[in-house]
Amino acid sequence: MRKFTLNDGRIRFGWMCLLLLAVFMGVVVRLGWLQIVRANDLRKQSENQLTADLTQKHPRGRIVDRDGEELAVSIMTGSLYVDPEGMSDDSLAAKARPQRDVRRIAADLLAPVLKMDKERLYKTFTGGGRFVWLKRTMDPKEEEQVRKIIKENKLPGLHFLEESKRYYTKKRTAAQILGFIGTDDVGLSGIEYQLNDVLKGKDTKYSLMVDAAGQQILGGLVNDKAQSVQKKQEQLPTVYLTLDSKMQYVLEDAMDDAIARTHAKGAAAIIMDPYTGEILGMASRPTFDPNNFNKYSQESWNNKAVSMIYEPGSVFKPIVGCMGLTEGIISPNTIFNDAGSIRIADRIIHNWDGEGLGYVPFSTIIKFSINTGMVQLGMSLGADRLISYAKKFGFGSPTGIDLPGEEHGILYNPKMMYEPDVATMAIGQGIAVTPIQVLRAICAIANGGELLKPYIIKKIVAPDGSVIQEGQKQVVRNVITPEVASQMRAMMEKVVSEGGGKTAAIKGYRIAGKTGTAEKLAEEGGYAAGKYIASFVGFVPADKPKYAMLVMLDTPQGAFYGSQVSAPIFRDTLQQILVAKGIQPTNREGLPSFDMMNTTDDKAKEKPKTIPQILLMPNGKIKLPDFKGIDMRYTAELLQQGHLRLKPYGSGIAYQQKPAPDTEVVEGTTVEVWFK
C-alpha cells in the first residue's frame, strides 16, 4: 500500500479549494440572476403575498327635490372581506390556536348572520388567495353582529373596509324616477343611470398591507397618497329635480289607492307645469323600493309614464279638434249630425252608449265625447293632415325628457292608411302613445299653443355652490294659435262642468279635461278582449292653468271608463294639492269663506288651543293632533308631514275629525276632516 505523501495532501487541498470556489461562484451567479433577471417577478410575488388590491368607492352625489329635500344619499358602511391565507393552518394566528379549526368555526358562526350557506362559506375560507369579498355594504346591525363574533372568537383573516352605500330616503316614492345602482356603484336605471357620470366619483385603487398572520397592518395602505385619498372623500355635485316632494307623496298615495280600488294591472300619473314643462310629480305602478330593488320584478322597475305605449282613446279628441279649428274646417258652433253610429267603408263605428243626439254643435261633440262627430271631422282632415298634425303635437317621437327608457309611440304611414284607419284615428284608435306625450300635447292647449320639452332635472350644483347645469323652458314649436287654444280650453271646461268628466270636478275651481277609454292592444296583435285603458287628462284652473295632470289605469277590473276610475283620482289628488299650495277657489258660489272670522258656526270659530303638530311615536306610529280651529291648507300640510292622506268635507275651518285627536295611526292612513 502506497504511503500518503505531502504531495497528495496538496492535491486534495487543491480539489477542495476548487470545489469551494465552484460553490461560491454558483451562489454568486444565483444571487445575481435573482437580483437582476427575476427582480421584478419576485417583487410582484412578494407584494401579492403581503398585499391585497382594493378599489375605494366614493359616496355618490345627492339627489334632492326642487326645495333641497333629500331623495337619494350615500352613507358609509362596512364591507366584509376575508384573507383566506390569513385563516390557513400555516398562518401565525392559526398556529397560535392549534386545537381548533378556525375556518369551520368562522363558517358556522357567520353563515346565519350573513344569510349564506355554511359549506359555501367554508369553501371560500379554504380556497386560498389574499382577498375575497364576503358581503358588501352591510346594514349597521348586521355589521355590528359580525364585528362582535370576530372579536369574541378571535377569528383571524376577517376584515372590514368602509364603502359607500346608496340610501333612498323615501323608499318607494319616485322609485322609477330615481332608479337604483348596482354593487359596483354604477347607476342601472332612472336618474342614477341618466346622470351616472355626474353622480359617481372616480374610483381610488390601492393596496392593503397585511402581516404574516393575515391581519391588516396599522394604517393599512401601501402609500401615503392612498391614505390621504381614503381620509378625504371626493365631493360630488348635487342633482336637484323639478319634483315637489309633497305633491309627489299625494300622487303616490293616490296611485296606491287606485290600484287597491280598481285592481288595475298597472298605472301611471304625471303632474306638469303647463307653462314651463317642469315635471312636478310622476308615479308608476307596480312600483318598488330601490333600497332593495332586487326583491322586486323587473316590470316594477319600468317607468310607465314614459315607456308604456297604448291607444289613447278619447283623450286624443281635443288634439283632433285643434286640427279642425286650425284648418278652418270647423268652429265650436259647427253643426254635426249625430245618428249614434256611422259607417266608413266596411266599418261601423258607434258612440260609446250607442245613442245619437241629432244635430249638435262641435262643442257638444267634445263635451259628450261623440264618436260620430269626430269621425266626420277626421274624414274631412284626411290621412295626410291627421298624421302631419299628430307629429307637430309630438306624437311618434320621444319628448326628450331627461329620463332613460322613453318610447317613441307609433304612427301610421299616411300612404298606407285606408278610410277606416282615418276614422278610428280621429277617435284615438290606431295610434300608440305614451302618457308623457299625451300630457305634453294637452299642455300646448293649456298654455296657448306652445309644445314644450318636459324636463325633470332642475339643476346640478357643484360642491362650491356654483350651478353646473340648469334646466330651462324649451319651446319645441308653436302648434296652434292662442285663439284655437282658448276655444279648446272652453270646450274642455264644459266636459268637466256639464259633460262626461263631471267626476273630475273640484268645487270652487274651474277644471278643463277629457276622459278616455280605449281597448287594450294585445301582444299578438289586435285587441285584448275585455281589457281597457282608462285615462283622464286635464288642467286647473281652466283659464290660467297652474297644473296639468294625466292619470292612466291599465286594465282596471269592474268599472273601466275613464270617467269612473281615472277622473276621480285627478280630482282627489289636485284637491289636496290646491289646498296645500294655498290656491284659492276662483268661484266661491256656494262655498263658505276661508276666513275663520267670517263664519257663523261657533264650533268653526273656535281657535286651536295650541299649534297642532304631527308626532312620531317610539313605536313608529303617528299621533294625530287636534285639527280643530285651523284651515284646510294647514291641515293638509300637517298630514303630508306624516305621510297621511286628507279626505276633506266642506271648506273653511276644521271643526271635526276622524280618527279622533291623540289616535295613533300608521303611514298612509286616511284622515277625514270636516270644515266650515
Task: Locate predicted features.
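Short beta->alpha transition motifs characteristic of CBS
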Residues: 58, 74-86, 184, 281-287
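Small/polar-residue-rich segments within soluble enzyme cores
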Residues: 105-112, 123-235, 551
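Short, small/polar residue-rich loop motifs at catalytic or cofactor-binding pockets
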Residues: 55-59, 263-266, 454, 648, ...
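Conserved, well-ordered alpha-helix/loop/beta-strand core segments that scaffold catalytic motifs
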Residues: 222-267
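Hydrophobic alpha-helical transmembrane signal-anchor segments
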Residues: 3, 7-41
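Ligand-recognition elements built from short beta-strands and adjacent flexible loops
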Residues: 508, 522, 551-555, 561-567, ...
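Second-shell loop/turn segments in exported
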Residues: 50-52, 81-99, 107-111, 128-137, ...
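Beta-lactam-recognizing serine transpeptidase/beta-lactamase-like catalytic domain environment
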Residues: 72, 213-230, 269, 274-314, ...
